[in-house]
């Protein structure tokens, strides 16, 4: 799509995302009226929706304009109107249509697109004696699983001489409190990164991670990092890639943080390297490198079809 202008249309509620996108020199439009009106005002040759479940009315307006549409992570009522739906975070359909999904619905990790930074990153080699762990939860992390996880495992890491990396996203709601808390802990092996631009670098040299069940688990699998996964809500719980057969110790939905259970699983994986190695070996058989080309190829076919019509 190098010969096309690319615009990002962000909803009124996505000002943080809009500012991050604009900072990368992309043309950005903030929603002014109805979202479909703002999209059609750009007279696009193709629309790519990355907004989770699409409303049917929104999609009907786009299709009435005869514009090809590609949706990502869409299980909503509007998804059936898309020309292609890429649901990489779901291993199988969640809402079936007449018992069968159309072929234009692409499900599972074989369609997960790695960010380019991970293609250059150095994948981790298994170490029986772990030297570094990673704690990372996406989104705003309103329950502050980040701090609760840190308080659970920090004493265990301290007594074993294991370094800790804590990484939060730009929407993390407890940044100032966490900075003060980390300073009070006084652990020289503890590092905090807020809204890092190069996540792959934070994963290099990591032996075990504790995280939520979002897109990060795919990046962890690519980097060969066995992980303890805490789903933050029902939608994340449906991301079934983050299970034992792909190298993850899945703890279910954490409606109430269970420090004792987390501590037990953490100690098992830290102190029993053979258990961690089983998860590591399963991840080493997973490959995402060619997925982006498959997905982009489908998008380019839709663009070509639009030009020929």
Task: Describe the residue ranges of each PLM region.
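Active-site and donor-binding regions of nucleotide-sugar-utilizing enzymes
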Residues: 1-4, 8-101, 105
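Short, glycine/polar-rich helix-capping loops at beta-to-alpha or helix-loop-helix junctions
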Residues: 13-19, 176, 235-240
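Donor-nucleotide binding loops and adjacent catalytic segments primarily
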Residues: 14, 127-206
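A nucleotide-sugar donor-handling region in carbohydrate enzymes
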Residues: 81-144, 174-176
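Acidic donor-binding loop of glycosyltransferase active sites
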Residues: 204-215
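Catalytic binding pocket for nucleotide-activated donors in carbohydrate/polymer assembly enzymes
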Residues: 217-264
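A short, well-ordered alpha-helix in the C-terminal region of glycosyltransferases
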Residues: 268, 274-289
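C-terminal alpha-helical cap of glycosyltransferases
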Residues: 288-309
